């Protein structure tokens, strides 16, 4: 948790609603313009993001990591799915960035219609005829990070991500896609 004049180590991925709202208010009072939150499936299930309406949301992946909490993959997916619809995501102009490489994404992207952008680290050429597909080519992974060419609908960008691993590259390009969509 950080904003101008404040920094602390978080005790949870996403704070409980009352504490989260107090922190968001303090950040606004410190003249922060944006908040970037990691929203866990636990926090969605426990209503920790009550009172938050997001401009944008990212679907990173769905793995078996949290089956200790969720009874099965379908209920885990249904919990994560809630983030992409009201009351959490703005209904008309909320931005959705989805990991095209995740097998669960087809269940979500069809529900979102034209509100979503797809991102891939596995496809080497755009297979889509729309303005909402982002992908990478020329990936190289080293001990110091990852490099690639990031293809947007309008340009190609040489990227260096100072984090190791394909999942970190995917997380980075999804975050960059949000910034791109927000101009």
Positions of PLM-derived features:
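Conserved helix/coil segment N-terminal to the catalytic DExD/H
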Residues: 43-50
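Short beta->alpha connector loops
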Residues: 40-43, 101-103
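Walker A (P-loop) phosphate-binding motif
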Residues: 1-9
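Acidic, Mg2+-coordinating active-site environments of NTP-dependent enzymes
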Residues: 30-32, 56-183
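Short, hinge-like loop/turn segments at secondary-structure boundaries
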Residues: 9-14, 53-55, 113-115
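Conserved nucleotide-sensing/catalytic segment adjacent to the nucleotide-binding pocket
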Residues: 8-40
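Short hydrophobic/charged patches on amphipathic alpha-helices used for structural packing
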Residues: 24-25, 46, 81
